[in-house]
Amino acid sequence: MADQTFAEAISKVLYPSDDHMQGKMLRLKQFYFLASATMQSMIKRHKAVFDDLNSLPEHVVIQINETHPALAMPELMRILMDEEDFGWDEAYGMVKKIFHYTNHTIMTEAMECWDENMFRLLLPRIYQIICAINEKYCQKLSVYYSKEEEKIAQMAVIGNNEIRMANLCVALCRRINGVSNLHADILKTRIFKGSYQIFPQKYLAITNGITHRRWLALANQGLYHLVREYVKGDILKDYHLFEQILPYKDDKEFCKKYEKVKRNNKIRFAKYIKEKQGIEVNPESIFDVHCKRLHEYKRQLLKCLHIIYIYQKIKKDPTCITTPITFIFAAKAAPGYARAKEIIRLIHSIQEMVNKDPDMDGKIQVVFVENYCVSVAEILIPAADISEQISTAGMEASGTGNMKFMMNGALTIGTMDGANIEIAERVGQENIFIFGDSAEGNYNKKMYHTYNPGIIFENHPGIRDVCNCLIEGNLLRYGNRKYSEIYQNLLFGEYGEADPYYILADFPSYIETYEKVYRLYVDHKDEWIKKAVVNTAKSGYFSSDRTIEQYNEKIWNLKPVK
């Protein structure tokens, strides 16, 4: 009974908070449990069909997404050696042919490292195998970097009493890909630079994709039927066909129907939020949407500061907003991510401050969508007018929300980051709104310590007033709290650089660019609709069908089943 209870605990809470040792241990057990079960099942199925495990690399390809499933590699070696009587070199060679690694983020916390002592205690046999892999890998590195011991130590799988899962993937996987062109370049030139210099043929870019079957045909049936009306062929089977609607951006009848679809989707969301949260929103307002995982690099905080900026602007000049704006947030924070939760509290305080102020009636409104999930996204994304893709340039690997929004006719305001760059290349710079510094510019600021947010604070009165609102003024009446830690982090830093996500650095550019977005919607609605049509027409490239085709052409080499 005790063994059964212990075993069941592994699968009771998926991915628990890992800000304490018990959470880390449970998470490692879960990773191993899932990896081992998958490898055992794969071996069993292969033997049932082919009988001979020597042919495994001819029939099996395993794509590791992030480092979470990386334990599958040493686990497969364990099965082959300990249960199937393969030698070390045979098992090692098979794993190197079978596994491929997709990196999805450059954030440090995603580059998983396990405490070596904990790992040895929980998974002793897997630890032995990883030690042998590390020794073999470091021997190979020493051929190329014979006089650079520090570099080899950084690239090693084991170092500083840690087991580095990203380095394990780099050591064993046949191909390594980023999920956008920029992301792949960053992997090659920064994150895995040492490996890339030795094995450049291993590295490539395959941009992420989304399925039009869910995010158009299911989530936005009005737009799906409109596109089908004007396109010859099945757009769900051939993503290239979306280009056929491009000429209709100049067709008044088509644009009128397109605009009506958007309005109906906004009415649908307004009904949803009224039913679920009791909030009334104006479907005639501009729906400005920031919905994604809550993380500092995704810069929900920048949007918060911008709303405070507009709030203060309206207080001084009520005529500055003629068409109302509904600012919509939807996000969840990781259980142990304190700063992310603090930003959610800030959003709620801003929501209360804005929505309870009679001066904001008919001007701006703030909505935080509760319990955000795919089902809610299917209602929210088709309703959006503005898509906020404002991550710190160089930190978003790709993003897929940006693709879902542009496909559904929202115009993007964003940085040159991740797949935003490729969206801009396809729709044209005139059909997207880009602001802020580049990935290279941000990298240089960090490397050469040239950034001082205090200068922006002192020289930009509007931004200074916004920052001060975090610790004084109207905001403090709502939520009964100061946001001193956020203020401190923006201007002075905490045990490191100030404003590490360059929020104040990009704030002036964001204010200027957003004004252009607003004026286009208010003063030139016909042009807005044309740009939205272009975005939908160019969304075909971002189909997951194209992504899968490229994985197959460049990595898997699978034959289609007819």
Regions found by a protein language model. Give the residues of each.
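A conserved ligand/cofactor-binding region detector
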Residues: 1-562
